[in-house]
């Protein structure tokens, strides 16, 4: 065991101050909302397609699950396709000197970005979704 620290004799101790300090006032949160406290780091919200991927998976194959790594890959894939379609749609709108991206630009972008049969199915599903949205 380590040796104990020796006690100082009473003569060496500092005299206790007899002056009383004024009591601290109670702080009431004002306009700043109690900014004196430590601020918690705000979490940056991250938008993902994970819940939608899972819903589609359960519609197509109700008995099959998906690993977190596979889900991450699917999320990256959808983000990539979204960026490609958005970029192509923006180019088409610029070429035609239009300030707005409409369903027509999106449809043309789908035909340009996706290959063959996949583009045909995507266009038909997109048209069906737009029709359902406008009718409701």
Curated annotation (Swiss-Prot):
Can be acetylated to form H2BK6ac and H2BK33ac. InterPro entries: Histone-fold, Histone_H2A/H2B/H3, Histone_H2B, HISTONE_H2B_site. It holds the Pfam family Histone. Residues 1-44 are annotated as: Disordered. One of its GO terms (molecular function) is DNA binding. The nucleosome is a histone octamer containing two molecules each of H2A, H2B, H3 and H4 assembled in one H3-H4 heterotetramer and two H2A-H2B heterodimers. The octamer wraps approximately 147 bp of DNA. Core component of nucleosome. Nucleosomes wrap and compact DNA into chromatin, limiting DNA accessibility to the cellular machineries which require DNA as a template. Histones thereby play a central role in transcription regulation, DNA repair, DNA replication and chromosomal stability. DNA accessibility is regulated via a complex set of post-translational modifications of histones, also called histone code, and nucleosome remodeling. This is Histone H2B.5.
